[in-house]
């Protein structure tokens, strides 16, 4: 069993929040860029920037126009559902790299992404953000994944992988792999031209906790082309409704796509976002939670683990 340490709550200045809230409550994706962390929340039009080692309030950066309703039910219906945040490699279009916030695709209004170019110091150039219509990309998946629910993404080796979350009884988790160069070129063109087709769609059975099936929630790249993921056992029968969570796991995937070892996370937090760095044989893991309750702040958790076969399951 894997023990994560509480690092901080994701608190914000109420005066800076569009609804006067003192925290982020639905963290859903996490990327670390140097000494900064960026977090996307699925019920906001902002992303948060924070120092993982500090206590200053999370800075909110607007990525989509307009404000969401204060009512929970109305907000859920209207939100863009930005479930995923992934780091993009430098290209001619964004020389210092970029972040890509991705809508889940589970409803027509949830099929947008936002490319956020980075400055040389790791800050986001908000004025240069690009909103991309992902409907053409998602339409190419409908024949195999009728109820799409994208919850994670990772650039690993030559692949850009989207993680589809299989909800409920009979739901199938899937890794949707694209040629990374093709997908980045399409994004650099603001989604113009024909959307790239996936080169593979691979289903994954992740098991269950307390009889509730595990489903992907996020991923982060590892050295050598492999990656690690988080998955949650949530009792939800579809891609829209939330359900009670029975716990989370952290797992590993080899560069060739083979599933490795999975570790149940102690104390059953609902982990929705994941970021990791590896140095000198140590894996430094950061994770964010979502309690599915707007009155509760999301939390930043961490762990330092020995990176090797005992952890990953690979020799």
Annotated model-derived regions:
Residues 1-315:
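Sequence/structural signature of beta-propeller domains
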């Amino acid at each position: 069993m894997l023990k994560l340490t509480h690092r901080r709550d994701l608190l914000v200045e109420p005066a800076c929040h569009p609804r006067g809230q003192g925290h982020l409550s639905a963290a859903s994706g996490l990327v670390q860029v140097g000494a900064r962390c960026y977090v996307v929340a699925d019920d906001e039009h902002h992303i948060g920037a924070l120092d993982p080692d500090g206590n200053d309030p999370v800075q909110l950066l607007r990525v989509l126009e307009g404000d969401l309703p204060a009512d929970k039910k109305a907000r859920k219906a209207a939100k863009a559902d930005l479930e995923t945040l992934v780091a993009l490699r430098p290209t001619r279009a964004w020389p210092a790299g970029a972040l890509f916030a991705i809508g889940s695709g589970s409803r027509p209004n949830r099929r947008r992404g936002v490319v956020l170019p980075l400055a040389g110091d790791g800050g986001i150039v908000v004025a240069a953000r690009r909103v991309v219509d992902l409907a053409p990309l998602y339409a190419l998946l409908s024949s195999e994944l009728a109820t799409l629910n994208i919850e994670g993404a990772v650039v690993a080796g030559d692949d850009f992988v989207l993680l589809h979350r299989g909800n409920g009884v009979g739901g199938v988790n899937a890794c949707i792999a694209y040629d990374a160069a093709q997908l980045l070129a399409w994004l650099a063109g603001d989604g113009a031209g024909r959307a790239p087709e996936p080169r593979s769609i691979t289903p994954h059975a992740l098991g269950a906790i307390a009889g509730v099936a595990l489903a992907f929630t996020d991923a982060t790249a590892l050295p050598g082309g492999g990656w690690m993921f988080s998955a949650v056992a949530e009792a939800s029968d579809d891609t829209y409704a939330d359900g009670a969570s029975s716990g989370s796991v952290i797992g590993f995937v080899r560069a060739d796509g083979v599933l490795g070892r999975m570790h149940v996370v102690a104390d059953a937090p609902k982990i929705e976002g994941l970021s990791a760095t590896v140095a000198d044989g140590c894996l430094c893991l950061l994770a964010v939670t979502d309690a599915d309750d707007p009155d509760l702040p999301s939390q930043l958790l961490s762990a330092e683990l020995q990176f090797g076969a005992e952890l990953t399951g690979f020799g």
